């Protein structure tokens, strides 16, 4: 069974074609700058990579490129389903869902909760249904994994009517990644997932930690939106809610302007004085003595360690810490500094193992006798493909 996985953003589409029976990715790619005349798709088959223009710079044009590539591979008729990443499923979805009119209506109803993401997801689904209309389409939600959080973790201390009438609560994100790496960590540790208490740290341009108890999320750092929690590439993470009114009064900024700044001009970029959000560049600049870069890296580690410790409190007992995402998988510096701060929880670093766990090399990075810390490569496309297959198997009884 070949499964096409799509992740539609406001100006991009990330795609992958997976053969689950052979555990292979046959095709992957990224269509960028959609909505402009310079839209281009980068296609990768193994080590071969090439770029092609996207007709009219639209989702439909991007999917025409994908269809053509499937034809060139001779596998168009073997594709059995399309799996879509959808950022926000609200309280409605605690599992992936076969997309029909009711599911689409429910995704639309979540737009106020994710105005930066769900509209693009919806537009991408609609264009994909036009391009691949004969295939079943499945929505896999970033928020679904965290629907097992107890109310003490997901409720905000705000008027009850805000929750009852408007759904104001903590939802969490990166759920597909947290669930995948938790299962992989259990496999690598040689222990059953349902017997483990894990903290998973997804560290990329967006960052979050989660407390995973027996394979179920019981807390996470992101909240109503992906803005809450850790310091991220351009997102602030936790700030005083009074900041909006303060900046409106002091600088004449609107709510929209403050929110945009917190999402796009803050985090590592803001702390470094606008140097950038790429951790590799910030680490290098910090090594050269750049004051802003040093502050950004140190604050990132400090807030990450506090986040991990908070998740450990939720678990009561911590069996292992998992690093994943672009930073988590590749920055030995960030991992080492974080574990040094977490010595109070029993972590000790194996410096050689940590140095080797880069560029796609997963493994244990903690010293003997330490609480285990390990690097696990996330694979959200594979997870979405597997969940898509599970939905179809439940619908048809087909285990292929």
From Swiss-Prot:
ATP binds at residues 14, 202-206, 278-280, 326-330. InterPro entries: Ac/propionate_kinase (IPR004372), Aliphatic_acid_kin_short-chain (IPR000890), Aliphatic_acid_kinase_CS (IPR023865), ATPase_NBD (IPR043129). This is Acetate kinase. Substrate binds at residue 85. The lineage of its organism: Bacteria, Thermotogati, Deinococcota, Deinococci, Deinococcales. Mg(2+) binds at residues 7, 380. The active site is at 142 (proton donor/acceptor). GO terms for cellular component: cytosol. Mg(2+). Can also accept Mn(2+). It holds the Pfam family Acetate_kinase. Its EC number is 2.7.2.1. Pathway: Metabolic intermediate biosynthesis; acetyl-CoA biosynthesis; acetyl-CoA from acetate: step 1/2. Its main location: cytoplasm. PANTHER family: ACETATE KINASE. One of its GO terms (molecular function) is magnesium ion binding. One of its GO terms (biological process) is acetyl-CoA biosynthetic process. It comes from Deinococcus deserti (strain DSM 17065 / CIP 109153 / LMG 22923 / VCD115). CDD domains: ASKHA_NBD_AcK_PK (cd24010). Its cofactor is Mg(2+); Mn(2+). It is found in: Cytoplasm. PROSITE patterns: ACETATE_KINASE_1 (PS01075), ACETATE_KINASE_2 (PS01076). NCBIfam families: ackA. Catalyzes the formation of acetyl phosphate from acetate and ATP. Can also catalyze the reverse reaction. The keyword Kinase applies.
